[in-house]
Amino acid sequence: STNPETITEIRRKMNFEEVKRIVKRVQEKGNVHQHLDLIAGLPYEDYERFAQSFRDVYALHPEQLQLGFLKVLKGSYMHEKTEDYQLLYQDRPPFEVLSTKWLSYDDVIRLKGVEEMVEVYYNSGQFVNTLRLLEEEFTDTFALYESLSRYYEENGLHMINHSRITRYEVLFAFIKACVEKNVENYRQMLILDLYLRENVKKRPEFAGEVSVDKQKASAFYEKEAEERRYLKGYEGYDKRQLRKMTHLEQINGNLYVFDYRNRNVLTNQASVFWVEGGDEAYPSGHPTHACGGQTSSDHV
């Protein structure tokens, strides 16, 4: 929680500004996978105040944002305060809170839905660029995941184990239902996110037909096999092997090559290079490299 009254009550005093400073300092090193946790059901934190804690912590952009629910264990301080806090909780493991003086059972269920959406779309790290755009469409980041959860429920999509590709398709359907402008740009970002993670051979429906024709792809790989300009570490492979091991995609009018042998150590995303334009695009002779796979929409 980032609520001063809450953290004082649970005897976990902290200076959130100092926490922010430390988190950002660790992020600057670029070599640590950060997990930040939020617990629902704490004293003095109702639904709206929890949403504020969510916004505060989400703004730090950890690799994982874990939403948990208070566990009322015998012998703990929370157990001692059961009556004061009007705690209702499960009578068997994991003894999770069901409602409190500040948080109704319906609120807990709503937060469970938000938790699932954060886990699927944020913590998976598979929708980075699409989410970055979506965050701008909503009043705040909590509202985004709240809306996603509501969309799942209203369309009978919750309580189902969806495939990875289906998660992309559902997100695109959500975007088309909620976003008035730039839907095509969102589609392009979904394609980018899709191929950053995996060299998908069977394109999902939302991705449409192959965006790079065979002649253009053949010309690129033939030249790359001779010059080795973009793909490093592939020296022992010919043009046909390069084509199988990497991926070419046309995104927002630009050509990109996805390198799956060289991935970001934190995100596991492929490295990606902008190759459209050849020498004219890179007067210095060095191709643009999008941060080891941390490609943002600004690059595309």
Give the positions of each predicted feature.
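Conserved non-cysteine loop/helix-boundary elements of the Radical SAM core domain that shape
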Residues: 1-92, 98-99
